[in-house]
From Swiss-Prot:
GO MF annotation list: box H/ACA snoRNA binding
Record's keyword terms, sorted: Nucleus, Repeat, Ribonucleoprotein, Ribosome biogenesis, RNA-binding, rRNA processing
Annotated Pfam families: Gar1 (PF04410)
Highest rank taxon of the organism: Eukaryota
Subunit structure: Component of the small nucleolar ribonucleoprotein particles containing H/ACA-type snoRNAs (H/ACA snoRNPs).
Organism annotation: Mycosarcoma maydis (Corn smut fungus)
Residue ranges with Gly residues bias: 16-37, 148-227
Family: Belongs to the GAR1 family.
Name assigned to this protein: H/ACA ribonucleoprotein complex subunit GAR1
């Protein structure tokens, strides 16, 4: 399995995070495809991977850092801080990461030997935890007390009685709102969040919650839809 960045720009590319096929752009991406400004070599570099073989003029490397994933377009160096290229693709499962290095002008991938080490600046790494599934919360939201009005709504929803009762219509609208917010918003947010990282989960979950709220207070509109 392979994945590319949704964008190749500088900065934190983990916003949309996840794995996708090579053709897709749903990887660790975010932003545009622009590169990093060339500010010279960093003060320190750390091992990022070892060279395996050349592929279509690029270096294929296996990550040796089990705790981090490199940014797309992050500069790659030798131990002496000489830049040789930039990260182009990230491949493989989360527990066995590979990456390719697009060579800088004058650099040739076939000039390297198997197991040659490549290095990266520490500020161009993302923690691997960012791309792992989030555990589901064990805490449950407190149930709201229904009261008499809630009872009327439940009666109508379950058996279809009391069609003309105002309380029945209000309750039915609230029910629709709850279903939309909890049923569609939460799974959609959870699904996207698990696969796509924090942004998907937060945005979709938030929208689902908002839909639920609107349904709850929009009894009139939802009630008419039911008819």
């Amino acid at each position: 399995m392979s994945f590319r960045g949704g964008g190749r720009g500088g900065g934190d590319r983990g916003g949309r995070g996840g794995f996708s096929s090579r053709g897709g752009r749903g990887g660790f991406g975010g932003g545009g495809r622009g590169g990093y400004a060339n500010a010279g070599p960093p003060e320190t570099v750390q091992p990022m991977g070892s060279f395996m073989h050349a592929v279509e003029g690029e270096m294929l490397c296996q990550s040796t850092d089990a705790k981090h994933v490199p940014y797309f377009n992050a500069p790659i160096y030798l131990e002496n801080k000489s830049q040789i290229g930039k990260v182009d693709e990230i491949l493989g499962p989360i527990n066995e990461v590979f990456f390719t290095v697009k060579m800088d002008p004058g650099m040739v991938a076939t000039s390297f030997k198997a197991d040659d080490k490549v290095y990266i600046s520490g500020d161009k790494l993302l923690p691997i935890e960012r791309f792992l599934p989030k555990p589901k919360s064990l805490t449950k939201a407190p149930k709201k007390k229904g009261g008499a009005r809630g009872g009327a709504a439940g009666g109508r929803g379950g058996f279809g009685g009391g069609r003309g009762a105002p309380r029945g219509r209000g309750g039915f609208g609230g029910g629709r709102g709850g279903a939309r917010g909890g049923g569609f918003g939460a799974p959609r947010g959870g699904g996207r969040g698990a696969f796509g990282g924090g942004r998907g989960g937060a945005f979709s979950g938030g929208r689902g919650g908002a839909a639920g709220a609107r349904g709850g207070f929009g009894g009139r509109g939802r009630g008419r839809g039911g008819y």
